[in-house]
Amino acid sequence: MLHPRARTMLLLSLPAVAIGIASSLILIMVMKIASVLQNLLWQRLPGTLGIAQDSPLWIIGVLTLTGIAVGLVIRFSQGHAGPDPACEPLIGAPIPPSALPGLIVALILGLAGGVSLGPEHPIITVNIALAVAIGARLLPRVNRMEWTILASAGTIGALFGTPVAAALIFSQTLNGSNEVPLWDRLFAPLMAAAAGALTTGLFFHPHFSLPIAHYGQMEMTDILSGAIVAAIAIAAGMVAVWCLPRLHAMMHQMKNPVFVLGIGGFILGILGVIGGPVSLFKGLDEMQQMVANQAFSTSDYFLLAVIKLAALVVAAASGFRGGRIFPAVFVGVALGLMLHEHVPAVPAAITVSCAILGIVLVVTRDGWLSLFMAAVVVPNTTLLPLLCIVMLPAWLLLAGKPMMMVNRQKQQPPHDNV
């Protein structure tokens, strides 16, 4: 016979698995549609018209039209494509299901059009809304927070292809007690995350790791080097934190999201022309291209880091529907490669992983997620102790500092003004 605690944990197991599978399938569907549209916009259409896909006019034109299209969706769709991600944490409150079609369309347009944002925030928002709406009908005795946690965990597992990230994130938010141990509370979310990760793995494998030279043995000087790299990444990230609410306020004075996002898309197009095609899109595939290109110099990496960070701020401030984690990882990789080129004595594994740790920590203010991203992009067990040590001064630097988010009470997203 199972203990009552075990029966309690098993109660949500089937819903957790179902939510994890559904979360992954929704992610896969959105990414597949976006990939087809991206191929049409950036490969087939310019080829048919006899235009180079890296033509400045094409880059500016596609991103400007993408901004206008997303603005029209936000302006006229029911629910105005959900909340402005610049004003929301990664895991937020459920939104009405009526806003989901507009949110999904806005996300697909942004991903396909080359906007420097990832899918994580909108996909989590969509899956939370569906889980809460359906779960409340099927199992009304289960509270909304449980459905929110399961949907978030399932989506995070699907996004990263592993339940580890969900375990790390929720281990600090689901506090245990004398009556309910932490792992009892983690059981159902981990089931959802595992189901999401395994489902994603049936269709494709998220590829985060970079072909960076293996790091052998940790030295004391490496800790100092890593801390300096993380501090540089944090400094760069805090510039973006300072810029985001100010640019957001300035752009949303126009009130109409079509104008705001059209101008935002035009600015992104100019940044894309300066940085080149590798500086477009969410950044995961592009960082692989950046590492593979042996022709890049220190100044090239610096330019890519600056352009991508600027594009991230502009896209978020404009109100594009997307997440900030994936492009932040690209910025960290570019910064790390730049610092390694500048000081070759410091291994690239240290500069890249510590730069990712620093910049993701600024964007998410989540220590576990920052460690996870650094560890999966530069997969080397020798680095783990160093990253844990470097996290300490990095966390001290950010203690009490503002987050990369717009204060909703001061700044209203564009759909609130229509």
From Swiss-Prot:
Q: Name one GO molecular function term.
A: chloride transmembrane transporter activity
Q: Where in the cell is it found?
A: Cell membrane
Q: What is this protein called?
A: Putative ion-transport protein YfeO
| Keyword annotations of the record | Cell membrane, Ion channel, Ion transport, Membrane, Transmembrane, Transmembrane helix, Transport
Regarding the membrane, this protein is recorded as: Multi-pass membrane protein
Q: Which family does it belong to?
A: Belongs to the chloride channel (TC 2.A.49) family.
Which coarse location class applies to the principal site listed for this UniProt protein? membrane
Q: Name one Pfam family in it.
A: Voltage_CLC
A single GO cellular-component term from the record reads:
plasma membrane
Q: Which residues cross the membrane?
A: 9-31, 55-77, 90-112, 122-140, 147-169, 189-211, 223-244, 259-281, 301-323, 343-363, 376-398
Gene3D superfamilies listed in its UniProt record: Clc chloride channel
